Amino acid sequence: AQVSQALGGVEISEEDNVSKVLTAVAEGSCEVGTTYYSDTYGYEDKLDILQVVSYDLTGDVIYPICQVQNDEADKTQTAAAKDFYKFVLSDKAKKVFDAYYFDTDIEK
C-alpha cells in the first residue's frame, strides 16, 4: 500500500509468483509489476519495461544445474544426463539463453 501511494495510487499486482505478475500486467488487470527480465520474453508487444534493475542492487540471479545420482538409471540415461549437463554449460547453449534474455555473462 505504501509503494502504491508513493507512486500516486498506481495499482501494483501482488501475486504468488512473478509469472502471474507478468500475466496480470500484460492483460491490463494491473498497471505495474516486478518480474524477472527473462520472463518478459514473448511479451515485448504487450509491455513497456520501465526499469531494469542493476545487479549491484539485486545480485546475480543464479539458476543452478546439477546431475543427481540415480541408481535406477541405466548407462544410456546417465550418459544423456552428462551430455545435457555439458551442453547447458557450452557456448552454444549460452547463445540460446541470451536469446531468451538470460544473462550468461557472470562470474563463475
What is the role of each PLM region?
Residues 1-108:
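Exported/periplasmic ABC-transporter solute-binding proteins
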